[in-house]
Amino acid sequence: MERTKIDILISGGGIAGLTAAAAFGTAGFSVICVDPTAPVTERNTDGSDLRSTALLQPARDFLETAGIWAKLNPHASPLQTMRIVDAGGEVAEPRLTRDFDASDISDRPFGWNLPNWLLRREMLARLDELPNGTFRPGVGTKTLLTRRSEALVSLSDDTQVSARLVIGADGRNSPVRRAHGIGARTTRYGQKALAFAVNHPIPHEGVSTEVHRTGGPFTLVPLPDYNGMPSSAVVWMERGARAKELYELPEDAFNDAMSERSCHLYGPLTLATRR
């Protein structure tokens, strides 16, 4: 069996795994990152991750050190204001609103929002620039044997890696965690989240808005304009059964439902991606 000797093996090619790979590679370590599923790096491709990630100031500085931020900056939406809206009651309407402005504590925004599919695309581009960094899509972790000075990892392509450090960045059902016998406890809250992007006629002006009602928050996070209109990423938390009902609605009915749930703060919302 072919064996490769490296400093670090990372199992998982999501945002956490690719960030670690780029950071360690930039620091001079030899790195291999594997993932059984190739990341989807286009917005409208089936399987793309339509969630977004808000990178706060320390994360932005870390990504700059890892050589990634210069690639992300042109696509990032600054988060200047955090707005909390209490819309409880029979009718979805704002009853209490509180704004928190980043200028009260810093000369920079709270953070910057980016779509997850785009984060993966730019992180892969950074990893591709590094002579000591390798990404291997379609390859997963099979077995893990730890010794005093190294870990021997067998991969799904029948190769083996000897690494000084193994990082499990492979999700809640982590093969690395299970291979090493590390247990986990699962707590279920009876909620599910719908994630998608929307267009709206009223600009968000860098405001991230959480609208709170029974069932969970409805959060709009700024994105760059899309198709000439203001755009936001949405995470809509609801009880499981209600989330399923919403997911199965025809698009026009879904647009109406989410516009009402948002209290029409940005005008009528229309889907800009699948949900």
Where on the chain are the PLM-derived regions?
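Conserved N-terminal helical subregion
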Residues: 2-4, 75-179, 187-192
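N-terminal Rossmann-like FAD-binding beta1-loop-alpha1 element of flavoenzymes
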Residues: 6-33
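Conserved Rossmann-like nucleotide-cofactor binding loop
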Residues: 16, 39, 173
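Glycine-rich FAD pyrophosphate-binding loop
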Residues: 25-49
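N-terminal FAD cofactor-binding segment of flavoenzymes
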Residues: 47-89
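Short helix-loop capping/hinge motifs at secondary-structure junctions, enriched
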Residues: 91-92, 201-205, 226-228, 242-244
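Conserved FAD/dinucleotide-binding core of flavoprotein oxidoreductases
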Residues: 105, 214-275
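Central beta-strand plus flanking loop segment that forms part of the substrate or channel wall
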Residues: 173-212, 216-219, 238-242, 258-263
